[in-house]
């Protein structure tokens, strides 16, 4: 079969030819405020707006020694700051933003609000009426706010294949962040998790482009609301991160180089960012690494040409932690800090996260005066920063100059706290039981049943259960990093003080009865350090148990970690845990493996020994309750794998790889029908229901309306080839039937394979998915629509190409071929 590629005239310019308007519609009032403020600023004022410092820099501390992370002492009684430091930062340097968490640990909303009110007041009074903007890593809920509702981490959310979940998480996160007066969150993370070694895999929505784009767009809308020009009091500005290919590091280690072609960057890694920008995202944080020798912080093509000019985007770009310093200290592409600043600002950086130094301000001022950084570039950056502050409401003092106050015994009259005059009552539902119930329900959808031999699950009441393993009675691995502290190492301390959450063991004991459940961890993590694989035995005997168990639940995986601390060389699960499971299997009792890990640790030696395997990912504080509900059958599994789980070292591939990436092995060579050599495939998952698929059909294929020219663009809708209207779609129908007495939410995933192309196509790509609720014995005909241009690919000239020819669509065990003419 031969496929003709249409080679037509090339366009010379990037971006959407048809989209002349900004991706976020311009608002005349917002732009008028921006220009009015900018016109009154001196160069010092402008440069200060471009600087972001850590909270430690303005905190009350006991000495004048160099401030390092967590060394400062903030008085938690009243949020007291150092008056001299505050005056220096805002009065002298005119700093535009503060970030991070006082004392490195989550704070109560009344403490947060006292600190941010004080900072906003000081900065507004000394920076021409422009308050600073405070940024925090609120990754899976308001995770640095004491008593807020925490949700499953992003990789777990992706396993739900339900975009309503990240949308709702975004809404609640924004609400509870604004209760603390936090207006700007460094989320969502939308790095494609292409390496299973990567220490930040759990922060992403998995390995697939569409899942990342869909989930990140949903959470962006949940966080920011429907109008990016006018965020409400229940909304926060997002900061998409980390632009881009952060999860493609060749070594799999944090902040190490990637080697991705511009063609693949455009076709895959860029698309989730594009989708979220189209959803209204107001800011972006940059990848700390480099690609093929070019640091992302110095890459004008990616920062300015692709994002700002290509998408007509007027948002703001901020560095990651001290990354301008990395240009000269680590990457050696600049001789000194001044040259590094020049390089980054001219590439398109608008704000630098230079946490403990104001050198940026003086050096950038010198660069402008020397003519090395144009004043127009400074004005452009400051416009973007001011626009962000106006959009989030900071220029309206009434949005942040609000006392926290005391929460009323009853909700204030007027519906959703509309009559409240303090933060405690304005955000009456902060940390509420209603939010907790939603978190449990979400966590249930975010767990995946991977094995259920002889239907050992669900467990019947009355069984004697042994719960063991280092993750059995520990909030830290349940939550992961960015949970109350950077590494998540304060989670047990905080959660047990709050006192309303359950570990896996505690929740199972509540569900099945305390007399029927006992705990013997057998293996524990070493609490003395962050070494992930340093687990120590805590006794290894079944003889000490109060009863002879009917079933054993082994909770295994990883401790919490974040960023470089999570770097590893060996993906294999720790030897102590593997040996523990092997010893448990020798008892002859059914062993249920509960995986609680941020990335897929290799467990091929013990999977055959288990009767069941459940993946919980990082389910957070309500994960214990969710797991207990699923194990008992009170809830049904509906999650699917958001990444490919490897079986062996050296077989780290993604589902959308090229055909030649599969090497013939004892398990068989790849073809469209064969099984792969992975442990569990992307999209795999079981439930307690018997769901069958049938009658996959192509119900309609639109006719093309002529041809479109090839052009450099940033979305498949700019593809050259057959031309289709914006509302055209290829419609597929498939019958989905629940042949069981249990209701279920079934993720219906449609993959498409391009059978012949001018460049080697991926084996298959997920093109659309939908979560379909099915009552017992219910059957539904599900319609799935794909725009023809979504089948396009990027060629070596960075042009989207849609080639006519044969394609194959797959849903579960159903396949159908179709042709685009």
Predicted regions and their residues:
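Bacterial Sec-dependent N-terminal signal peptides
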Residues: 1-23
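Glycoside hydrolase catalytic-domain context in secreted enzymes
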Residues: 18-795, 803-817, 821
């Amino acid at each position: 079969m031969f496929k003709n590629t249409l080679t037509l005239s090339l366009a010379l310019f990037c971006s959407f030819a048809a989209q002349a308007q900004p991706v976020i519609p311009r608002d005349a009032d917002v732009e008028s405020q921006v220009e009015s403020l900018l016109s009154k600023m001196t160069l010092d004022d402008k440069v200060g707006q471009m600087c972001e410092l850590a909270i430690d820099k303005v905190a009350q501390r006991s000495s004048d020694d160099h401030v390092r992370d967590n060394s400062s002492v903030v008085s938690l009684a009243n949020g007291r700051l150092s008056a001299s430091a505050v005056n220096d930062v805002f009065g002298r340097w005119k700093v535009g933003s503060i970030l991070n968490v006082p004392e490195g640990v989550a704070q109560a909303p009344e403490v947060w609000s006292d600190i941010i009110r004080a900072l906003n007041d000081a900065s507004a009074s000394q920076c021409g009426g422009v308050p600073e903007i405070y940024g925090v890593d609120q990754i899976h809920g308001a995770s640095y706010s004491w008593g807020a509702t925490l949700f499953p981490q992003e990789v777990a959310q992706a396993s739900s294949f339900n975009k309503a979940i990240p949308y709702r998480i975004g809404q609640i996160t924004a609400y509870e962040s604004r209760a603390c007066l936090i207006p700007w969150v460094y989320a969502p993370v939308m790095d494609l998790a292409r390496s299973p070694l990567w220490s930040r895999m759990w922060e992403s929505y998995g390995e697939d482009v569409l899942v990342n784009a869909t989930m990140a767009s949903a959470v962006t809308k949940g966080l920011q609301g429907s109008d990016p020009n006018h965020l409400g009091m229940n909304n926060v500005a997002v900061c998409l991160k980390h632009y881009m290919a952060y999860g493609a590091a060749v070594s799999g280690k944090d902040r190490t180089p990637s080697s991705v072609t511009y063609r693949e960057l455009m076709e895959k890694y860029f698309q989730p960012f594009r989708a979220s920008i189209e959803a209204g995202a107001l800011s972006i944080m940059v990848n700390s690494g480099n690609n093929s020798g070019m640091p992302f912080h110095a890459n004008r093509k990616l920062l300015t040409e692709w994002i700002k000019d290509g998408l007509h985007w007027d948002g703001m770009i901020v560095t990651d932690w001290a990354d301008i310093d990395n240009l000269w200290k680590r990457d050696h592409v600049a001789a000194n800090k001044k040259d590094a600043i020049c390089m980054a600002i001219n590439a398109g950086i608008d704000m630098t996260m230079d946490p403990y130094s104001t050198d940026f301000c003086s050096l950038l001022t010198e660069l402008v005066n020397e003519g090395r950084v144009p004043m127009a570039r400074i004005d452009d950056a400051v416009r973007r920063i001011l626009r962000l502050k106006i959009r989030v409401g900071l220029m309206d003092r009434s949005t942040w100059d609000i006392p926290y106050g005391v929460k009323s015994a009853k909700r204030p009259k007027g519906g959703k706290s509309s009559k409240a005059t303090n933060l405690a009552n304005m955000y009456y539902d902060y940390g509420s039981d209603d939010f907790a119930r939603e978190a449990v329900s979400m966590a249930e959808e975010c767990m995946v049943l991977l094995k259920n031999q002889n239907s050992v699950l669900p467990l019947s009441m009355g069984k004697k259960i042994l719960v063991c393993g280092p993750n059995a009675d520990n909030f830290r691995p349940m939550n992961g990093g960015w949970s109350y502290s950077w590494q998540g190492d304060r989670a047990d301390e905080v959660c047990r003080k709050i006192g309303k959450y359950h570990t896996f063991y505690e929740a199972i004991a509540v569900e099945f009865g305390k007399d029927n459940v006992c705990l013997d961890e057998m293996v524990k993590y070493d609490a003395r350090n962050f070494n992930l694989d340093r687990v120590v035995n805590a006794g290894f005997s079944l003889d000490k148990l109060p009863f002879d168990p009917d079933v054993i639940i082994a909770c295994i995986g990883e401790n919490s970690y974040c960023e470089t601390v999570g770097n590893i060389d060996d993906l294999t699960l720790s030897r102590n845990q593997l040996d523990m499971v092997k010893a448990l299997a020798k008892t002859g009792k059914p062993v249920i493996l509960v995986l609680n890990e941020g990335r897929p640790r290799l467990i091929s030696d013990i999977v055959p020994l288990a009767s069941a395997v459940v993946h919980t990912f990082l389910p957070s504080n309500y994960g214990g309750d969710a797991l207990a509900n699923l194990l008992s059958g009170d809830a049904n599994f509906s999650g699917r794998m958001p990444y490919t789980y490897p079986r062996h070292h050296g077989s780290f591939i993604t589902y959308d790889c090229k055909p030649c990436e599969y090497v013939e092995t004892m398990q068989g060579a790849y073809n469209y029908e064969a099984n792969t050599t992975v442990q569990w495939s992307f999209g795999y998952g079981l439930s307690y229901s018997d769901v069958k698929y049938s009658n996959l059909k192509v119900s309609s294929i639109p006719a093309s309306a002529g041809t479109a020219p090839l052009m450099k663009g940033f979305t498949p809708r700019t593809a050259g080839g057959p031309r289709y209207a914006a509302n055209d779609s290829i419609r597929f129908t498939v019958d989905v039937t629940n042949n069981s007495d249990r209701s279920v939410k079934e993720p219906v995933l449609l993959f498409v394979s391009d059978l012949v192309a001018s460049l080697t196509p991926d084996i298959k790509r997920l093109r659309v998915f939908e979560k379909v609720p099915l009552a017992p014995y219910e059957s539904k005909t599900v319609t799935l629509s794909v725009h023809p241009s979504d089948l396009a690919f990027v060629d070596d000239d960075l042009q989207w190409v849609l080639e006519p020819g044969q394609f194959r669509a797959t849903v579960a065990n159903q396949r159908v071929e179709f042709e685009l003419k």
